[in-house]
Amino acid sequence: MYKEEFLVEVETILQAYKESFSSKTYSMESNISDILMESFGISASLKRENRQYWGRELGMIWQLIVNAIFKHHGTEYAPALKFGLDEPCDLICGNDAIDTKYRIGSGDSGTLKKFKNYGHLLRSNGFRPVLLLLRDDSLTAAITACKTGGWEVFENKDSFDYIFNNTGVDIVELLHYFENKFQIMR
């Protein structure tokens, strides 16, 4: 019916994926809260219902808040740079080209290549690429790719410190100021 060589090849593929699936571990990301989740009263269980949705939305909030902080309190603020259709960062503060991410959860080659290319593009135009991550549970391969691409990567408290050192705004204190005002009801 099927050639033995074919069956062995398919079996080898299936076995390799069985082992990969069996040994797959998931980050604790979905069980850990952060300052934005707390601002809205988003529980870990609610976030687990649709991680991609919450990650995308919380990432946009992070980007908008950081941008507003630098716009109103940063020195030498400028909006995002554009190179053709590409927008390799969210804002400029002096020589720092700042991009914001909630976390980097994708390790696909396209995403990693983009970070490397954008880092080189920004450096070649006289900027220091700075990546401000809200969380500290991003994929290690993604962080490595960013650093290889010339990005200065700050995670969690280091991001908060960077923001404070460049604007005087304590983002944790700022979000606590609005605590319980925007709790979602579900």
What positions do the PLM features span?
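Short, well-structured alpha-helical interface segments that form or flank functional binding sites
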Residues: E57, I61, I65, D86, ...
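Short Pro/Gly-enriched beta-strand edge/turn motifs at strand-loop
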Residues: K71-Y77
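Surface-exposed cleft-lining segments at the edges of enzyme active sites
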Residues: R51-G55, T100-S106
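Conserved catalytic cores of phosphodiester-cleaving nucleases, focusing on short active-site segments
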Residues: L91-Y102
